[in-house]
UniProtKB/Swiss-Prot annotation:
InterPro entries: Ribosomal_uS14 (IPR001209), Ribosomal_uS14_bac/plastid (IPR023036), Ribosomal_uS14_CS (IPR018271)
Pfam families per the UniProt record, alphabetical: Ribosomal_S14 (PF00253)
Region feature (Disordered): 1-26
Source organism, top-level taxon: Bacteria
Taxonomic lineage from the root: Bacteria, Pseudomonadati, Pseudomonadota, Alphaproteobacteria, Rickettsiales
Known partners and oligomeric status: Part of the 30S ribosomal subunit. Contacts proteins S3 and S10.
Family that this chain belongs to: Belongs to the universal ribosomal protein uS14 family.
NCBIfam families xrefs: PRK08881.1
One cellular-component annotation, GO: cytoplasm
Protein name: Small ribosomal subunit protein uS14
Organism in which the protein naturally occurs: Rickettsia akari (strain Hartford)
UniProt cross-references to PROSITE patterns, sorted A to Z: RIBOSOMAL_S14
Length: 101
């Protein structure tokens, strides 16, 4: 089980990222617009830098929903490989069966 503080930190990053997503994407689209003067684009870059670091979506870590494990998390299920294997073995994941050949 992961530390509760690291799980809470990741949750707060998700909330900040969602709340500032529109502002951040609008600034980025204006920064990459070549029709705007260089001085204005530089001021937009500075305003983007003033936003909190944790509002960036790249700082969010995919964690297991059951254990909080940060590595080996499947995108489809949102569960770590260990728990997924355990649940599939018990037959608790619908539509997934253990293969045998």
């Amino acid at each position: 089980m992961a530390k509760v503080s690291s799980i809470k930190k990741n949750e707060s990053r998700k909330k900040k990222s969602q709340s500032l997503h529109n502002k951040r994407s609008a600034l980025k689209s204006k920064i990459y617009d070549k029709n705007i003067s260089l001085e204005e684009r530089f001021s937009l870059v500075m305003s983007l830098a003033q936003l909190p670091r944790n509002s960036s979506s790249t700082r969010i870590r995919n964690r297991c929903e059951l254990t909080g494990r940060p590595r080996g998390v499947t995108r489809k299920f949102g569960i770590s490989r260990n728990k997924l294997r355990e649940l599939i073995g018990r037959g608790l994941v619908p539509g997934v069966i253990k293969s045998s050949w």
